[in-house]
């Protein structure tokens, strides 16, 4: 089958009429579309699904977790923390019950991902001392929360009280699971001083959190799967400050 010609020229004795067959307005001239330079890396990362391996097609996670419904809601927690050698804990799954875009509708919701952004920094009196201090972050799931969050020393077993060797105690392994572990380092001294370090982590979780009938966003109102962020620095005498913004992206459950 022959291709349709781009245009047809109809010749008459009086005039020549050029008829266009692209069905657009005859009064608009053709404007050249701006060309965007695409690199090989962008072409490879944005390739269609049929060009990816079978694993990407079979085990592709859905946008909305199973058993949940949209829209995607966001809850942020901003605070400055004094991180010591003995550790500190904050609850990052505190969500108030309500009808807003930052509230949970009922008792159950699924935390799809969490975004930790901020920095750790030293005081003016500490940064001139020759030392290296590393802050260890542990994102922990508490399967059976009750009362108040347990301290760092109660959950983790550290050799010689060193947070870098922290592991969950044997009798608490069924209750606490470390979902992600990361760290950031600052260095003090007159030379090669690094008084602050950035913290930027995006973590995919898909953790189903269950509350009781209360509306307040508190740890004691959790009944299942509370998310806790434990922090501890490796230096015993020099504390570190952490200015963090923790954002959780969650979906409401259909069982509410």
Curated annotation (Swiss-Prot):
Transmembrane segments: none annotated. Its main location: virion. Gene3D superfamilies: 2.60.120.20. Keywords: Capsid protein, DNA-binding, Host nucleus, Metal-binding, T=1 icosahedral capsid protein, Viral penetration into host nucleus, Virion, Virus entry into host cell, Zinc, Zinc-finger. The lineage of its organism: Viruses, Monodnaviria, Shotokuvirae, Cressdnaviricota, Repensiviricetes. A motif (Nuclear localization signal) lies at residues 40-54. It is found in: Virion; Host nucleus. This is Capsid protein. GO terms for biological process: symbiont entry into host cell; viral penetration into host nucleus. A zinc finger (unnamed) spans 68-85. One of its GO terms (molecular function) is DNA binding. Homomultimer. Binds to single-stranded and double-stranded viral DNA. Interacts (via nuclear localization signals) with host importin alpha-1a. One of its GO terms (cellular component) is host cell. A motif (Bipartite nuclear localization signal) lies at residues 3-20, 200-247. A motif (Nuclear export signal) lies at residues 101-122. Encapsidates the viral genome into characteristic twinned ('geminate') particles. Binds the genomic viral ssDNA and shuttles it into and out of the cell nucleus. Plays a role in protection of the genome from degradation, virus acquisition and transmission by insect vectors, infectivity, and systemic movement. The CP of monopartite geminiviruses is absolutely essential for virus movement. The keyword Membrane does not apply.
């Amino acid at each position: 089958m022959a291709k349709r010609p781009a245009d047809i020229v109809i010749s008459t004795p009086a005039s020549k009429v050029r008829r266009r067959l692209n069905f657009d307005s005859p009064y608009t001239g053709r404007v050249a579309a701006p060309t965007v330079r695409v690199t090989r890396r962008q072409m490879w990362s944005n390739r269609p699904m049929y060009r990816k391996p079978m694993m990407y097609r079979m085990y592709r996670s859905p946008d909305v977790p199973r058993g949940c419904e949209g829209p995607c809601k966001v809850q942020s927690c901003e605070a400055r923390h004094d991180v010591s050698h003995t550790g500190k804990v904050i609850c990052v799954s505190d969500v108030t019950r309500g009808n807003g875009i930052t509230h949970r509708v009922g008792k159950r919701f699924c935390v799809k991902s969490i975004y930790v952004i901020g920095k750790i920094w030293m005081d003016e009196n500490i940064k001139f001392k020759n030392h290296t201090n590393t802050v260890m972050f542990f994102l922990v799931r508490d399967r059976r929360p009750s009362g108040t969050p347990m301290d760092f020393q109660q959950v983790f077993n550290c050799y010689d009280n060193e947070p870098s060797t922290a592991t969950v105690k044997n009798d608490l392994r069924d209750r606490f699971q470390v979902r992600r572990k990361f760290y950031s380092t600052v260095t003090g001294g007159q030379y090669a001083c690094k008084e602050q370090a950035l913290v930027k982590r995006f973590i995919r979780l898909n953790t189903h959190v269950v509350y009781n009938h209360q509306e307040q966003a508190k740890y004691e109102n959790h009944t299942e799967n509370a998310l806790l962020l434990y922090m501890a620095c490796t230096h015993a005498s020099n504390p570190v400050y952490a200015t963090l913004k923790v954002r959780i992206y969650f979906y409401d459950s259909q069982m509410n």
